[in-house]
Design a protein with these regions (language model features):
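Short amphipathic coiled-coil heptad-repeat segments
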Residues: 1-15, 196-209
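Non-catalytic DNA-recognition/assembly elements of restriction-modification systems
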Residues: 6-30, 42, 174
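Activation segment
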Residues: 18, 55-56, 194, 202
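DNA target-recognition domains and sequence-specific DNA-contacting regions of bacterial/archaeal
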Residues: 23-170
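A detector of tandem-repeat and repeat-rich interaction/domain scaffolds
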Residues: 181, 192-194, 199
Length: 209
C-alpha cells in the first residue's frame, strides 16, 4: 500500500514483509548490571533497562555512556554478534507494554559493542537508510502488532519467534527511507532544544521567586 502522508516525488507502493524475512537475529549476552563496569572495560554493552528508559529510537554510541564489559571470555564467545551501525536492539522484557521498544545503533566506529540481557539484537538482511528502522519499529503502527503477542502478568515479555511473523512496512527507495529518518531526527533535536529552554526558564523562575 501507500502511506497517506508522504514526501513529494515518491509514488511507489511500500513493501510489506514479515520481520523474519527482513531482519536476522544475532546473539545477546546475559550479563546483569552487577557484571558490568561504569568505569572501564574492553567493550560496551547495551542493557535492556537503558533501551526502555534512557535511549531514544537512535542510539549514538559516541554520545551515550554505555556500561562496559570487562571479561575477555565474553568477547570471544559473542564475536559473531559484535554490533554494527544499523543494527536494532529490542528490549524483550519490561514491567508493562513498553516491551518491544528498541534503539537503532549509530555512530559506531571501531568500538566493540554487544547487546545485553533481555534484548534481541537484529541485523537488516538488506541495507536500510540510517534511522528508518529505529523510528518505524517504535511507531504505533508496528508496536500495536506486538501487544497481543506479549506474555506475563507482573513482568511482560515477547519472544523472538512471536516477532518473526509481524509485518514491517517500508519504502523500497533508500532515499525516501533516509528522508523519513532525518525528519524524525530533526523533530527529536527540536524537542531536546525546547526541553533545555524549558528547564532554563524554570531555573530562572525559581531563582527570581
Amino acid at each position: 500500500g501507500k502511506p497517506k502522508i508522504r514526501f513529494k516525488g515518491y509514488e511507489d507502493d511500500w513493501e510489506q514483509r514479515k520481520l523474519g524475512n527482513v531482519l536476522l537475529s544475532l546473539q545477546n549476552n546475559t550479563l546483569s548490571r552487577a557484571n558490568l563496569s561504569d568505569e572501564s572495560g574492553i567493550a560496551k554493552n547495551v542493557h535492556y533497562g537503558d533501551v526502555l528508559i534512557k535511549f531514544g529510537e537512535i542510539l549514538d554510541v559516541r554520545k551515550e555512556k554505555l556500561p562496559m564489559i570487562t571479561d575477555e571470555n565474553v568477547l570471544s564467545k559473542y564475536k559473531a554478534s559484535f554490533l554494527q551501525n544499523g543494527d536494532v536492539i529490542v528490549a524483550d522484557t519490561a514491567e508493562d507494554s513498553t516491551v518491544g521498544k528498541c534503539s537503532e545503533i549509530a555512530g559506531l566506529n571501531d568500538e566493540v559493542v554487544l547487546s545485553g540481557l533481555h534484548t534481541i539484537p537484529y541485523r537488516p538482511i538488506e541495507k536500510f537508510a540510517s534511522g528508518y528502522l529505529g523510528y518505524y519499529l517504535n511507531s504505533g503502527a508496528y508496536h500495536n502488532q506486538l501487544i497481543p503477542l506479549m506474555q506475563g502478568i507482573k513482568v511482560t515479555s515477547i519472544s523472538k519467534s512471536a516477532m518473526q511473523n509481524t509485518d514491517i512496512d517500508y519504502p523500497k527507495s533508500q532515499e525516501e527511507q533516509g528522508k523519513i529518518g532525518a525528519y524524525f531526527k530533526s523533530l527529536d533535536e527540536m524537542i531536546t532544544l525546547h526541553q533545555r529552554k524549558c528547564e532554563e526558564t524554570k531555573s530562572l523562575k525559581k531563582y527570581m521567586l
